[in-house]
Amino acid sequence: MRDPVETYMNLVPMVVEQTNRGERAYDIFSRLLKERIIFLTGPVEDGMSTLVVAQLLFLEAENPKKEISMYINSPGGVVTSGLAIYDTMQFIRPPVSTLCTGQAASMGSLLLAAGHKDMRFSLPNARIMVHQPSGGFQGQATDIMLHAQEILNLKKRLNEIYVHHTGQTYKAIEDALERDKFLTADMARDFGIVDKVIDKRAEESAPGPKVA
């Protein structure tokens, strides 16, 4: 049976662009990267995190002041992989706008909230989910205790990040993340994860999710 990821990559369309040196072909994602658009799709794990971080650093080197647009459709994933993306978003100089298409769950919702203030968007039918980190550990009792303490430390840190970006109190975030909390786009806006729900682009020529 063929690897579904390999099958998917084989179906990625190519775009042909006319230049003064003739035709040049790009896969669609590389062409959109030229427009400073990054796609964060699928589970958040080390491989995907490395690619997103590399794209952020590349676009900063290209132009340290021009906005970067990040389109998010992710069920979440590995906390440390997500934090690598988060820290890079805060570290680089260009403002990063975020736009949720489909879903932003778990670490996906944190990265959605991590966009530049007033530049965090959601499409109207997107779903956002927040919750506390989870993990399963095996081994000696002492090791399990150490892992349990580490996940509590991560929980506290993630809560603090949500507090910083949403404007909610720590208690409100702690209560909201106690269980899976599913939000509509409007609810996510009211909660402070996004700034605006958009259903169309104000300027058709603009590559990123800019609105009037």
Swiss-Prot record:
Active-site annotation: 106 (nucleophile), 131
SUPFAM superfamilies: ClpP/crotonase
Keyword Transferase attributed: no
Subcellular location: Cytoplasm
Coiled coil: none
EC top class, as a word: hydrolase
GO biological process: protein quality control for misfolded or incompletely synthesized proteins
Keyword list, A-Z: Cytoplasm, Hydrolase, Protease, Serine protease
PROSITE patterns reported in the protein's UniProt record: CLP_PROTEASE_HIS
InterPro entries: ClpP, ClpP/crotonase-like_dom_sf, ClpP/TepA, ClpP_His_AS
Family note: Belongs to the peptidase S14 family.
Role played: Cleaves peptides in various proteins in a process that requires ATP hydrolysis. Has a chymotrypsin-like activity. Plays a major role in the degradation of misfolded proteins.
PANTHER family: ATP-DEPENDENT CLP PROTEASE PROTEOLYTIC SUBUNIT
Subunit-level organization: Fourteen ClpP subunits assemble into 2 heptameric rings which stack back to back to give a disk-like structure with a central cavity, resembling the structure of eukaryotic proteasomes.
Name of the protein described by the UniProt record: ATP-dependent Clp protease proteolytic subunit
Organism for this UniProt entry: Rhodopseudomonas palustris (strain HaA2)
